[in-house]
């Protein structure tokens, strides 16, 4: 196939799958890569929503056994109920603020310079928190108290600022309240399922009519690319952070945000 947009759709799908669950901001990466590629065949918001669904499907597949077990055992197992309760409680703060300030976020905060500043600031925060060498006390989501979940949920509110990174804010909050690195990463994955599914349903409800039959092969290519790349990245991330931590992602954010800032300054 000689259609350059088909290749661009695959590239953007890979970018989404790689960056969605790393604490590096998928928004910032999709903005810059989409602009560099000049990808405009599919309405941007529609395409972004669909490839996010591909990334979420990867989490559901990878953790299908654990998620099924939690749902099955919830009536009789306290740990399973803790798991479900922690997800629900952590969703509340950002969910409320997101509804209240949705228009403000889109109209005021969704600018290249805000994204750059959020990338750099978030990177500095990750490096600083890792250098604190905090002693982890919580080693599984099933052991979360509702207070722990609420504190992490409050941190997730920061991710309403474009460029902060939903997974980055969740992981930072988890580390600060004593969650071990692997569990912090996994909680960010589990929390992403209802967050991104809900956001996708709302977005598709408002934009599905923009999809044409000519776009379907591009949407499918991006979806599959996001699914496969997310599968690989999530498996690697859990192993990597257990022994290396998140510092490298902090430095990457600082570098990427600085380069983006230079790029947008020169292009304007």
Swiss-Prot record:
Record lineage: Bacteria, Pseudomonadati, Pseudomonadota, Alphaproteobacteria, Hyphomicrobiales
Disulfide pattern: none
Entry EC no(s): 3.6.1.27
Organism: Parvibaculum lavamentivorans (strain DS-1 / DSM 13023 / NCIMB 13966)
Entry-linked PANTHER family: UNDECAPRENYL-DIPHOSPHATASE
GO process annotations (BP): cell wall organization; peptidoglycan biosynthetic process; regulation of cell shape; response to antibiotic
InterPro entries for this protein: UppP
Protein name as it appears in the record: Undecaprenyl-diphosphatase
Any GO MF annotation of the entry: undecaprenyl-diphosphatase activity
Localization per record: Cell inner membrane
């Amino acid at each position: 196939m000689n259609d350059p947009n088909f290749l661009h759709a695959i590239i953007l799908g890979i970018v989404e799958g790689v960056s969605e669950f790393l604490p590096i901001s998928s928004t910032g990466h999709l903005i810059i890569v989409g602009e560099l590629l000049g990808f405009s065949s599919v309405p941007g918001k529609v395409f972004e929503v669909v490839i996010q669904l591909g990334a979420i499907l990867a989490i559901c597949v990878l953790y299908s056994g654990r998620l099924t077990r939690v749902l099955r055992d919830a009536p009789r197992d306290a740990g399973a109920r803790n798991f479900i309760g922690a997800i629900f409680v952590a969703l509340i703060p950002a969910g409320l603020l997101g509804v209240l300030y949705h228009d403000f976020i889109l109209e005021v905060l969704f600018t290249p310079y805000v994204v750059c500043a959020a990338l750099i600031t978030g990177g500095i925060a990750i490096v600083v928190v890792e250098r604190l060498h905090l002693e982890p006390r919580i080693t599984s989501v099933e052991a979360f108290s509702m207070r722990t979940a609420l504190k992490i949920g409050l941190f997730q509110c920061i991710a309403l600022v474009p460029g902060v990174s939903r997974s980055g804010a969740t992981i930072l909050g988890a580390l600060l309240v004593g969650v071990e690195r692997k569990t912090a990463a996994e909680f960010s994955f589990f929390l992403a399922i209802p967050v991104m599914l809900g956001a996708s349903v709302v977005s598709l409800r408002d934009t599905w009519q923009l999809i044409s039959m000519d776009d379907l092969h591009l949407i499918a290519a991006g979806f599959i690319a996001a699914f496969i790349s997310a599968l690989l990245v999530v498996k690697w991330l859990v192993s990597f952070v257990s022994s290396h931590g998140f510092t490298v992602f902090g430095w990457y954010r600082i570098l990427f945000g600085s380069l983006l800032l230079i790029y947008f300054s020169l292009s304007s």
